[in-house]
UniProtKB/Swiss-Prot annotation:
Annotated keywords: Antibiotic resistance, Methyltransferase, Plasmid, RNA-binding, S-adenosyl-L-methionine, Transferase
Gene Ontology MF: a single term: RNA binding
One GO BP annotation of this record: response to antibiotic
UniProt keyword annotation of Transmembrane present: no
UniProt name for this protein: rRNA adenine N-6-methyltransferase
Length: 244
């Protein structure tokens, strides 16, 4: 995505009072290293450097990089990188957390990037409220792919009045806690295929009629519109058994 489109999709939170309310829900300490997705005008960056060991802010807008650097002139535990987060290479040999107030229109791309291309153990994001709810919906492919790697929680509402320009909808602060992957490396491709066929209701491409009924019974599923992630994993495990 180009810089112009990113800039036009940005909504900033600048009130220290509102930022402090959001920060109370984020677990940080003086030993944490943080990657911030989009420093904006540096308001969250300033709070992060006061709480953490080191902050690396990744900002695509050159002018906002300079604004952030000027705002943090009295601090030396940070760097601002003028880069596109979707092209950024996260380190693989250090512990870190991620925070970001991310653009609505590339939320899916960003969340895929940081879950599958980073090793962050905790990820805090401000996202559109409807998007946050979709991340908990097992009828959505993105939710099913993410739930195999992270535990997803909605921590708090972020009212649209906090932002300028003010968006049309409210936002949420979400947390993604990394866990041991529920899908083995050798099964990743098979899992991705199963997810896509399942959410598109192409059941005949993954089960025979008898296999389907037996798998539902084994998973304890009575309603296809209301299944848990554990039940979905049970279906996938049945699929693997039938396709050895």
């Amino acid at each position: 995505m180009n810089e112009k489109n990113i800039k036009h999709s940005q909504n900033f939170i600048t009130s220290k009072h509102n930022i402090d309310k959001i920060m109370t829900n984020i677990r940080l300490n003086e030993h944490d290293n943080i990657f911030e997705i989009g420093s904006g005008k540096g308001h969250f960056t300033l709070e992060l450097v006061q709480r953490c060991n080191f902050v690396t802010a990744i900002e695509i807008d050159h002018k906002l990089c300079k604004t952030t650097e000027n705002k943090l002139v009295d601090h030396d535990n940070f760097q601002v990188l003028n880069k596109d987060i979707l092209q950024f290479k996260f380190p693989k040999n250090q512990s870190y957390k991620i925070f970001g107030n991310i653009p609505y229109n590339i939320s899916t791309d960003i969340i895929r990037k940081i879950v599958f291309d980073s090793i962050a153990d905790e990820i805090y994001l401000i996202v559109e409220y409807g998007f946050a709810k979709r991340l908990l919906n097992t009828k959505r492919s993105l939710a099913l792919l993410l739930m195999a790697e992270v535990d997803i929680s909605i921590l708090s509402m972020v009212p649209r009045e906090y932002f300028h320009p003010k968006p049309k909808v409210n936002s949420s602060l979400i947390r993604l806690n990394r866990k041991k992957s529920r899908i083995s490396h050798k099964d990743k491709q098979k899992y991705n295929y199963f997810v896509m066929k399942w959410v598109n209701k192409e059941y005949k491409k993954i089960f025979t009629k008898n296999q389907f009924n037996n798998s539902l019974k084994h998973a304890g599923i009575d309603d296809l519109n209301n299944i848990s992630f554990e039940q979905f994993l049970s279906l996938f495990n049945s699929y693997k058994l039938f396709n050895k």
